[in-house]
Amino acid sequence: MDLKGLTAVELGKKIQAKEVTVKEAVEACFAQIDKVEKEVNSFVSLQKEAALKRAEEVQKLIDDGTLTGPLAGVPVAIKDNMCTEGVTTTCSSKILSNFVPTFSAEAVLNLEKAGAVVIGKTNMDEFAMGSTTETSYYGETKNPWNLEHVPGGSSGGSCAAVAALEVPYALGSDTGGSIRQPSSYCGIVGIKPTYGTVSRYGLIAYGSSLDQIGPVARDVTDCATVLETIASHDVKDSTSVERQDTDFTSALVNDVKGMKIGIPKDYFGEGLDEEVKKPILEAAEVLKNAGAEIEEFDLGLVKYAIPAYYVIASAEASSNLSRFDGVKYGYRTKDYEELHQMYKKTRSEGFGPEVKRRIMLGSFVLSSGYYDAYYLKALRTKALIKKAFDSAFAKYDMILTPAAPTTAPKLGASLSDPIKMYLGDIYTISVNLAGLPGISIPVGRDAKGLPVGMQLIGDCFQEKKLFQAAYTYECLTEKKWVSMYDKTETAGKGKA
């Protein structure tokens, strides 16, 4: 039986039905990894021995009826900025290359309680700072649809692993689009939940007011199932929200009749590639024909989202990353005579160029002479962006936009031009600033065969509406091309 093309829920059903053992599911993942990993480079580390041992433990719990959930026995990959007890957690940075946490992130623990089997930690942009997964200390990840292109970022390793059929689903984190943009580039489904829905305990912080953990998978059902599993109130995270409506799979209904969907005109103007625009508007037409009410409107403020985001995120990063100094854990330079010299050399040698750039920017905007001019102004802009979304959601159930302005760029195209890389997140950043949920779903491909993703944005705590609309679209289009990539046959070119 070919297991690698199954979704997480499909695989979970076969495990519960005793058609497949957990060990067979894990071995199928590693067999695919052996075939494709050298080219794709999705993983920073693999835990084969531990995963096989865990598979035996989970199998016993399934056999005796203790574990009956949809993800029991299903392999998962974890982005390498989430702590995993006893397993190296690097943030794809030299400075944490030897860091082994003594605890696991709450989201990881929730998956393990549900019977998931962690098979490895995925590659990412260093400290989640980047949009291409090219800033990793462990080398670039490549897009499984075309190995000459980036997978997006910063959760590029998680998304590439799912697209390359190395694992049924994975966890990513999203600070400014780091789940939704690579999901779009890799032709999979990814959701950033409302801020506070998933505990950030054990997530190594980048921008604490913006970071949120979410799943990436091959279809909407998997995403809803995983989010339902990892969402929980956690007293260890002061920003965690206690919700009673996290039964997200109940929203998997093929029906959008009467839903009001707004299309912001300013998201479809200059800068949007025509090969991206066309399939997204066609997808909107599919929802309209199914009974949704589609209307264009002016959202405004989108042009201010990127500058506001990079001021706020960099300011928070400069503070969060000050803890990495070589004293208690992580990399420490060998060549120093005095303590202050050790700090300086450790950080200079341990951080990559993009991380240094953002630390410098953050330190600058927080300095006494510029705090009011930049940081406070960015916070005011953030509040205005939230207000603009509030006005839109008074009229619409959700907002439909592109997930990214283009399909995946070529490797190296953005490294020499940081502004170009930052603009790759222009349609996703405002969602983080406002703390809203957003989902990216595949809707087509461009002339090169690269995937195009559509983003649906909801009001706070309205993930169910997003899942319902996304699931309806998926049903109506029969998922004709989703997960068609098979590396063993196509050598990274994708299928027509």
Which functions belong to the PLM regions below?
Residues A31, K35, A164-A170, T175-G271, ...:
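Structural helix-boundary/capping segments
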Residues L71-C91, S250-G262, A315-K386, P437-P451:
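Short helix-loop capping/hinge segments that flank enzyme active sites or metal/cofactor-binding pockets
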Residues A25-C29, A308-Y309, V355-S363:
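Short alpha-helical scaffolding segments that buttress acidic/His motifs in well-ordered protein cores
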Residues C29, A51, K79, L111, ...:
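Conserved hydrophobic/aromatic pocket- or pore-lining residues that grip, position, or stack substrates
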Residues L71-I213, P264-D266, A315, T401-I419:
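Short glycine/serine-rich loop/turn segments
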Residues K18, K79, D219:
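Short, conserved phosphate/pyrophosphate- and ester-handling motifs at nucleotide-, phospho-/glycolipid
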Residues K13, L301-V302, D325-L433, C475, ...:
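Serine-dependent amide/ester hydrolase catalytic core
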Residues M1-K53, N289-G291, F364, V482-A496:
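An N-terminal boundary/leader segment
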